[in-house]
């Protein structure tokens, strides 16, 4: 199945609480969880690339400039049509600008079919995305969650998720990627809903939205 509606998220949350009753207080306090679903394609991937390693506020500011420059959520061709001066003024790091150009060229040429990739199983889809320089595991996982509706992905490399899991379970220090991955195994086949839950917990505890944007 895929996560395609708020009802799917609600179902997943109910199932999660049955799987792991420790999540019940979080679920009761934080539901309903947001769907956060975008159409598969260049705009969704680009939004996630922009979100890499920066605050949500910074990412949204940069994204707003991209949308303004391209006249809407950017198609690959519209992004490639931007001149160098405009791209330089978007606020992107050199690495992100390079990644966006590489991805846009691949999409425009047909060598990267983001709709088809979103429909693949997790391992194959991640393998096809991460061959592109600048698209790592976190970016691929978030794309599949929020543009493909994959129900069972937990991006353990996400610092906010690790902090939220550690806080919820009383860890003295933020758990590492391996520890969080092991904890999240218990939440199959709804790890993507668990990720939404812990992003919501992080936002509630810190007052800062950390879930990556793809819409």
Regions found by a protein language model. Give the residues of each.
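C-terminal accessory module of base-excision DNA glycosylases/AP lyases that mediates lesion recognition
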Residues: 1-33, 98, 122-123, 137-215
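Alpha-helical ds-nucleic-acid-binding substructure associated with the helix-hairpin-helix region
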Residues: 3, 22, 26, 54-133
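A positional/architectural concept
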Residues: 11, 18-48, 53, 57-70
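A general alpha-helix detector
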Residues: 44-49, 65, 82-86, 124-128, ...
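A generic structural signal for residues located within well-ordered alpha-helices
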Residues: 45, 58, 95, 156-157
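Generic alpha-helical structural context detector
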Residues: 47, 51, 64, 68, ...
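A broad detector of the eukaryotic-type serine/threonine protein kinase catalytic domain
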Residues: 50, 71, 84, 108, ...
């Amino acid at each position: 199945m895929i996560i395609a509606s708020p009802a799917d998220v609600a179902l997943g949350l109910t199932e999660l609480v049955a799987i792991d009753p420790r999540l019940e207080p979080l679920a009761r306090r934080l539901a309903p969880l947001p769907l956060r679903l975008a159409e598969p394609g260049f705009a969704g991937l680009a939004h996630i690339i922009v979100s890499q390693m920066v605050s949500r506020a910074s990412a949204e500011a940069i994204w707003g400039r991209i949308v303004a420059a391209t006249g809407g959520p950017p198609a690959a061709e519209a992004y490639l049509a931007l001149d160098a001066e405009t791209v330089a003024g978007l606020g992107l790091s050199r690495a992100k600008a390079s990644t966006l150009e590489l991805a846009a060229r691949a999409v425009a040429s047909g060598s990267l079919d983001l709709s088809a990739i979103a429909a693949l199983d997790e391992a194959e889809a991640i393998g096809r995305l991460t061959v592109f320089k600048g698209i790592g595991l976190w970016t691929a996982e978030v794309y599949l969650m929020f543009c493909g509706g994959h129900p069972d992905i937990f991006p353990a490399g996400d610092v906010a998720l690790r902090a939220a899991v550690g806080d919820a379970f009383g860890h003295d220090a933020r758990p590492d990627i391996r520890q969080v991955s092991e904890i999240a195994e218990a939440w199959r086949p709804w790890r993507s809903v668990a990720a939404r839950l812990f992003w919501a917990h992080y936002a509630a505890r810190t007052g800062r939205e950390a879930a990556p944007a793809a819409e």
